[in-house]
Amino acid sequence: MPNKPRRNEILPHENLRIDIFFFRITKTDLIPYAQTMYDSFFRILTSSKSYENEYVMRAVMRLSSALYEGILPCLSQLMEKLVMILQRSSKNPNKPNFNHYLFESITVLIRTSVAQNPATLEQFEQVLFPIFTPIFTDDVAEFIPYVLQIIGFLLESHLTGSIPDAYRALFQSILTPSFWDRSGNIPALSRLLQAYIEKAGETIVKEKLVRIFDRN
């Protein structure tokens, strides 16, 4: 027995039902229009009236995810725009959904690019670490869990026993007791600490790890 329509529900005629798979949009469909779409998105996100529009930032994230390696031709432009937005938002991080999609967009770029070309790892570090450092020093609590996750992934992508000096300098910051007092930081901190132990345990971790646990 067919289901009874709910009030105000409009059901299509049987002859008008269309296979939804016919309309599935693929990466190939998106690539020719990607640049135009990004230009439109960032025109909104750089406008003084709508620069923290969470729906547009979500669209950036979803388009970037759908494009996968098709995103590479736009990589430099996207990182420049996203870093600019990150710098601006870090001064007043009062839009949690927007912030989430912003960091998700950055993460998609990193994961896709490093998977296709490991040499881009250093480029991301050069661009992002100068932004991440003041987030730590200014204790921007809303951003720290996201930053820790991204740094953890970047560090995990390095060969064991070989990490840049920037990570060594940062290690001192992640041992800050206040970071560990916030439950929201713990998962990302734990993963990042594990990455430090795996990649450079003998050189920078062993003698300093006791600081986390010896807090009398």
Enumerate the predicted regions with their spans.
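Karyopherin-beta/Importin-beta family HEAT-repeat alpha-solenoid scaffold
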Residues: 1-216
